Design a protein with these regions (language model features):
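Gly/Ser/Thr-rich phosphate-binding loop
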Residues: 1-39, 52
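Active-site glycine-centered loops adjacent to acidic/histidine catalytic or metal-binding residues
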Residues: 13, 45, 115
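Conserved C-terminal helical docking segment of ANL/AMP-forming enzymes
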Residues: 15, 141, 154-159, 175-211
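Short Gly/Pro-enriched turn/cap motifs at secondary-structure boundaries
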Residues: 38-47, 70-71, 107-108
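Conserved ATP-binding/catalytic segment of the ANL
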Residues: 62, 70-141, 153
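C-terminal boundary motif of the adenylate-forming
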Residues: 65-67, 114-116, 153-177
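Conserved C-terminal "lid"/linker of ANL adenylate-forming enzymes
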Residues: 135, 161-162, 171, 192-238
Length: 238
């Protein structure tokens, strides 16, 4: 139990760079969560001292050297790249992944986090999911976290996951404990109505209920989206 005046400081980062940014929990709830539930992504705060953060154009290819034209304007969603004293410069004996994840900038190295996000006018970073999990449909890009947090605000939804098997944006839904299977048709109808009310979600064409999402063993929290996508295909739902 925290004291009444206590707070938590969840860090944003990765094995290759930790921490990158941080925002007090009270500020997340009071100042940013309402925007999260409208599809803005999750605010992870300001960069910590000695860390530089840039948001660059999304690419699945290696980028050998940094150039100013890679950087996006505030408010645009792109790849998150960081540099600083706690950022690793290479993967041991792994040139292919080093080339895909590191960008040379003179004497410095930028690390591509593998995440997508955007920066607001206050300099805060907003997390929008993993780059590899984005869904491409009809020339547009859908990002997982902005979409999912809209639906997660529904009282019957425990968690949701956007996947895109065969290019069809599909929302997998795990319901809160105690929700009956018989309630699903009405919940699905409500979720479809919510989807049409937001530009981040109005391309979602499938809503499927999953009994219990696959998650990683280490954290018991990271959703196995690849497994969910295969499950959707195997069920003939895509």
């Amino acid at each position: 139990m925290l004291p009444d005046d206590g707070d938590v400081f969840p860090p944003y980062g990765a094995t290759e760079s930790l921490p990158v940014a941080c925002l007090p929990g009270r500020e997340i709830v009071a100042k940013t969560w309402a925007e999260t539930e409208k599809g803005a992504g999750v605010c992870v705060g300001l960069p910590v001292p000695d860390i530089e953060v840039k948001v660059i154009r999304i690419s699945d290819d290696a980028i050998a050297t940094f150039s100013d034209d890679l950087e996006l304007e505030d408010g645009e969603i792109g790849e998150i790249a960081v540099r600083g004293p706690m950022v690793t410069e290479a993967y041991f004996a792994d040139e292919p992944n080093t080339a895909l994840s590191k960008i040379r900038d003179g004497d410095f190295i930028w690390h591509r986090m593998g995440d997508v996000g955007w920066r607001d006018r206050e300099g805060r970073l907003w997390f929008c999911g993993r780059k590899s999990h984005r869904v491409l449909v009809d020339g547009a890009t859908m990002f997982t976290v902005p979409c999912e947090k809209i639906f997660d605000a529904h009282p019957a939804v425990y968690r949701s996951a956007l996947v895109g098997p065969r290019g069809l944006p599909t929302l997998c839904v795990e319901l809160e404990p105690g929700q009956r299977s018989a309630d699903w048709p009405e919940i699905e109808r409500q979720l479809r109505h919510i989807a049409q009310a937001h530009p981040q979600t109005n391309r979602i064409s499938r809503f499927v209920r999953h009994p219990s999402f696959p998650v990683d063993i280490r954290h018991n929290a990271k959703i196995g989206r690849e497994k969910l996508a295969k499950w959707v295909e195997a069920k003939g739902l895509s």
